[in-house]
């Protein structure tokens, strides 16, 4: 099945900026995160979204993808590789090896005994709203493959060692020679008996079964920076799986899921909340206490405040994860209309309305009421 276009997965155009790509990724990753979305295909969609973002957020990978798509430009035609054949017998034609190298990728066979970096690992961590805002230090356990302590990674039983493969004589390749009218062609393929290593294990280590690696749970101490947000990830260098043949270890990527808060909402480094006001507080003004992540602060409400009015508490938001100060807290007031009134309260409100006279019918509200009256009277 053909892979979907990365731009299509994130729902952005091919000219999208890095900020637009990041915004689309954050929105979709929240929607399809397996901890939130319980649909059967949510995990697969989340994986697809993450893969698309990892490519499009990296300038080099994105340029490569824009040029070649999902195809590997080194693959050549139908998996044919020039290194599978020896064109030494074409000396009279001059440069045949270079010609085939040009057309079919020209890659040399990778040495299976060469050092290779270990695999990267991913770990998903759930944080509370406050933990994400202020950061924390914690220990986590991750399952990973590690070098076998019994054989020290050789795969051979202690006291024994790997032996030279008798089928390929240590070359890691098996060659078949074919004569043609144009000369001699030697076909080389990876030795199926030793897997191209040129060696085989006669007596395997009983602990790892000859693989040289065992499954373990590794405890890692992690320092989570203050200001981390939902969907962001933290790279812990060198804590992935160990390298092969002396290669460097991979990295550990911790992806964070932040639980929603019952009172606050977050947008970047800013925090939003709603505060209820009584009719009297809004009309007469008041000084109220507002909860923030940093404790309660006093907020002065001016007389005549309307529902939906927004106040800003500077520096009371979330610390920037890169250390660039703090965001702000935005307080939106909502004037609460009472629904259950006693007879005395109703009478007082009627008296208040009568005492108000024409005050509600002056200014912009007055023009609105005049239009309503004219509409009911049929005036234009």
Swiss-Prot record:
Cofactor binding, per record: Binds 2 Zn(2+) ions per monomer.
Native species: Geobacillus sp. (strain WCH70)
Family: Belongs to the DnaJ family.
Protein name listed in UniProt: Chaperone protein DnaJ
Zinc finger (CR-type): 135-217
GO biological process, one term: protein refolding
Top-level taxonomic group: Bacteria
Cofactor names: Zn(2+)
């Amino acid at each position: 099945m053909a892979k979907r276009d990365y731009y299509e997965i994130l729902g952005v155009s091919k000219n999208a900026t890095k900020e637009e790509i990041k915004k689309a990724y954050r929105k979709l990753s929240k929607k399809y995160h397996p901890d939130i979305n319980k649909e059967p295909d949510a995990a697969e969609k989340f994986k697809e979204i993450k893969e698309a973002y990892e490519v499009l957020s990296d300038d080099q990978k994105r340029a490569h993808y824009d040029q070649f798509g999902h195809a590997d430009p080194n693959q050549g035609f139908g998996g044919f590789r020039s290194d599978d054949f020896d064109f030494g017998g074409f000396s009279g034609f001059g440069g045949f090896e270079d010609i085939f190298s040009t057309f079919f990728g020209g890659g040399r066979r990778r040495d299976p005994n060469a050092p290779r970096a270990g695999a990267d690992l991913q770990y998903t961590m759930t944080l509370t709203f406050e933990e994400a805002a202020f950061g924390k230090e914690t220990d986590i356990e991750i399952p990973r493959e590690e070098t076998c302590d019994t054989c020290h990674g050789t795969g051979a039983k202690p006291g024994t060692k790997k032996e030279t493969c008798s089928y390929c004589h240590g070359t890691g390749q098996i060659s078949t020679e074919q004569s043609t009218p144009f000369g001699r062609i030697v076909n080389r393929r990876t030795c199926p008996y030793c897997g191209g290593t040129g060696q085989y294990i006669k007596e395997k280590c009983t602990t790892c079964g000859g693989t040289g690696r065992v499954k373990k749970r590794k405890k890692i101490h992690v320092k989570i920076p203050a200001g981390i947000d939902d969907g962001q990830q933290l790279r812990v260098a060198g804590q992935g799986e160990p390298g092969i043949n002396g290669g460097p270890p991979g990295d550990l990527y911790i992806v964070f899921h932040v639980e929603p808060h019952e009172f606050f909402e977050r947008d970047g480094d800013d925090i939003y909340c709603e505060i209820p006001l009584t009719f009297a507080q809004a009309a007469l003004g008041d000084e109220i206490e507002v909860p923030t992540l940093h404790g309660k602060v006093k907020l002065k409400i001016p007389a005549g405040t309307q529902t939906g009015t927004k106040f800003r508490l500077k520096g009371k938001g979330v610390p920037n994860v890169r250390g660039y100060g703090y965001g702000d807290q935005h307080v939106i007031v909502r004037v609460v209309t009472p629904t259950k009134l006693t007879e005395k309260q109703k009478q007082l409100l009627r008296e208040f309305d009568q005492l108000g006279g024409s005050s509600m019918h002056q200014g912009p509200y007055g023009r609105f009421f005049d239009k309503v009256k004219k509409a009911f009277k049929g005036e234009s």
